[in-house]
Amino acid sequence: MLRRFLPALVVLMVAAAGCGGGSKSNGEAAKTADQVVTDAKAAATSAKAVHVSGSITDAGQPLTLDITIVKDAGGQGTMSESGLKFEIIRVGSKAYIKGSDAFLRKFAGAAGAQLLKGKWLQGSATTGDLAALAPLTDIGKLFNGALGSHGKLENKGETTFKGQKVVAIEDTTQGGTLYVASTGTPYPVAIVGGKDQGTITFDKWNDTMSITAPKGAVDMSKLGSN
């Protein structure tokens, strides 16, 4: 499921790809669509922290996420697919996951679910089953990957998203709209629509946040070794 979730999120972000502080216009509304996306990516990848949340639909299945990311530290939050919920944490090169009872029963069976109930599993964030978490918990990887390629873009001008002034950038090839703050720093604010219908929002840019590794995690490499 982790391997399916990331591509679905990236597709939505690429098809469309927080809040920018301040009230003075930053000039993004007058720029080309490609320049707005370039500026948004630069702003996002330079940020110290961000909160990413929302839901999309992949192959008819609802996917949701709520993740806090801290630059050069890691990230933590929750994700779910079709009611199967799990918590994730990445601290440096280590990743952790704790699944709901339903999640564990599906992927570990009844006996495994009973054994792992309420426990965190630990693995590598660079190789293995949990490697897919890395791009979702790394500001640079998330926004460079998501905003690094896209279809033909069109600047639809200034509008508002939930009361915030933004520039709407539409991907006329793949569908979807990226909203970028048109005042203050041009941070990505939200992604709406696209191939995978849904909305992803970005907020709490540069807020003070901390990521802590869970205690007593079970090393995944040792499961089933006996």
Regions found by a protein language model. Name each.
Residues 2-6, 20-226:
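Subset-of-secretome marker
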Residues 15-18:
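C-terminal motif of bacterial Sec signal peptides marking the signal peptidase cleavage site
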Residues 5-13:
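Sec-dependent signal peptide hydrophobic core
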